[in-house]
Amino acid sequence: MKWLSRSYMAIIFLILYAPIIVVMLFSFNASGSLSHFAGFSLQWYRELFRDGEALTALKNSLFLAVVSSLLATVLGTFAAFSIYRSRSKRYQRVMESVSNIPMMNPDIVTGVSMMLLFVGLTAILKFNDILGLGTMIIAHTTFNLPYVILSVLPKFRQMDKNLTEAALDLGCTPAQTFLRVELPSILPGVVSGLMMGFTLSLDDFVISHFVSSPDFKTLPLYIYNQTAHEVKFSMYALCTLIIIAILALLIMVNVAGSVGERRQKRSSKKVGARK
């Protein structure tokens, strides 16, 4: 049975990672042809960094991902804190369910509804065109919020309440207790939510397609426009760089989570020893 289990897992991993491996491999292909591999070359990476439109789209995507993920992390952390501190279990269940709905909602429905909202605001406020960077930030922050809440709320519930009580007994104000005790305890969840929001924002195409303007194009929109006509090998290089960046983010999240858990365990042991 072991060989069957291992064979099954090998097939699953092959299906999952074969497309990624092919993209990364052909990003170094010297021939510029999909029919054969003529050797390793960095020419497509050089061509990519000479493409001004691609670099502009990359800058737009990075700026949008950073701003929207930071906003979503701040708002989502305080939303999770509010849910956690509520004394009503019914309120907590309702708010959790409401915050989970956008994650189950199809992206195309979210994109169309946001577009209609922004177009309606354009008519009400009598603006010529409201779509652009502002609407992109609002949209990306909105769909990132539930993921931040989902990451942070369990950390609040796993937090050792003895640490909070000890800080209050020692004279800390509620604000100081949150910043010095509770925030370090939930930091792995906050970082996970931030990285998840950054990745989702960087990757988003459907919602961005409906709320963007011709003057502000993100990387997924640029790649789609390019592949709609002819697949350039520089796009393989671009996809490879994105894959490497996301892999680095995942490693950072895992490391931050492990470090945070070890710190929390050490703090709990110290409080227990003092008691």
Model-derived features: positions:
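Periplasmic/extracellular loop-to-transmembrane helix junction in inner-membrane transport proteins
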Residues: S33-V66, S88, A228-E230
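C-terminal transmembrane helix and the adjacent membrane-cytosol boundary/short C-terminal tail
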Residues: M1-Y8, I12-I15, L153-L168, P174, ...
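Membrane-interfacial helix termini and adjacent extracytoplasmic/periplasmic loops
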Residues: S33-S35, L42, I108-T141, A175, ...
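Non-cytoplasmic
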Residues: I21-G32, G189-Y224
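Short membrane-interfacial helix/loop motifs at transmembrane-helix boundaries
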Residues: A18-G52, L117, H209-P214, S267
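Membrane-cytosol interface at the C-terminal ends of specific transmembrane alpha-helices
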Residues: D129-L168, Q176-E182, S192-L194, F205
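Transmembrane-helix boundary motif in ABC transporter permease subunits
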Residues: K2-W3, V67-S99, V119-G120, F178, ...
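Interhelical loop and adjacent transmembrane-helix boundary motif
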Residues: Y45-A54, L202-M252, A256-V259
